[in-house]
Amino acid sequence: GKKVLKERDAREHLNCVFIGHVDAGKSTFCGQILYQTGQVDVRTIEKYEKEAKEKNRESWFLAFIMDTNEEERAKGKTVEVGRAHFATSEKRYTIMDAPGHKSYVPNMIAGASQADIACLVVSARKNEFEAGFEKGGQTKEHAMLAKTLGVKFLVVVVNKMDDPTVNWGQARYDEITSKLKPFLKSCGFLVKKEVKFLPISALTGANLVAAVADSTCPWWGPMYKAGTHNTDQGALLPL
């Protein structure tokens, strides 16, 4: 009989951990990635939409893909590190959705210690970025831990750019990135080489698979094409 050798998947495998302050949108972001890469079907999404509505958390339906236990869904908080897999034509990924709440830092450390890449999610919404970045917020703590645990590459996603308080405004994006750069440098990241910045909306999926439309955000195209933000790609997955 013929021997059929299972071909080894030659695509590079990367572990990516999603970190950041509570409510920055990490679970929604992970859910959106899985949806856009075809890991979740429309029926499942519709089921989650219905369930989220019943729990008065309408905008949380994508997060339910990652937050599978009842406690997480009821509170709208991630407690354990959620894991999922997806692949692009070039790479295979395992994504880990780490809890952002202060009392769950040990769980977050467990996730980050296995990661090749960390994705730091910050919220652009008025006051939310500040809550995560100022005293007591988890944005700084998570970024420092990621560096300490040996994460070599960081993608900073500025989420909720579609929020009415932001409306894809460049001023807010610039304000946030200019605060983060010196801080990340102080953590030991070589900002020009090891950190990329990207404005996104996890809820609408803008800038995930394809760059956001110029009509929505006219300044992003020229910015990434000029390479000013260490990125030559307009959207996250091509990175």
Regions from the language model: what does each represent?
Residues C16-A24, T148-V158, A210-D214:
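Short, compositionally biased low-complexity segments
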Residues L5-P106, A115-E128:
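P-loop NTPase switch module centered on the Walker A-proximal segment
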Residues F29-I33, T44-K47, N107, E141-L145, ...:
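Alpha-helical scaffold elements adjacent to nucleotide-binding pockets in ATP/GTP-utilizing enzyme cores
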Residues G1-L14, Q138-L149, K185:
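Gly/lys/ser-thr-rich phosphate-binding loops in alpha/beta enzymes
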Residues K91-T94, A98-S103, S113-D174:
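Conserved Switch II/interswitch segment of TRAFAC-class P-loop GTPases
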Residues K152, D163-L239:
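Canonical P-loop GTPase G-domain recognition
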Residues A10, L14, Q36, V40, ...:
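Catalytic cores of large soluble enzymes that bind and process phosphate-bearing ligands
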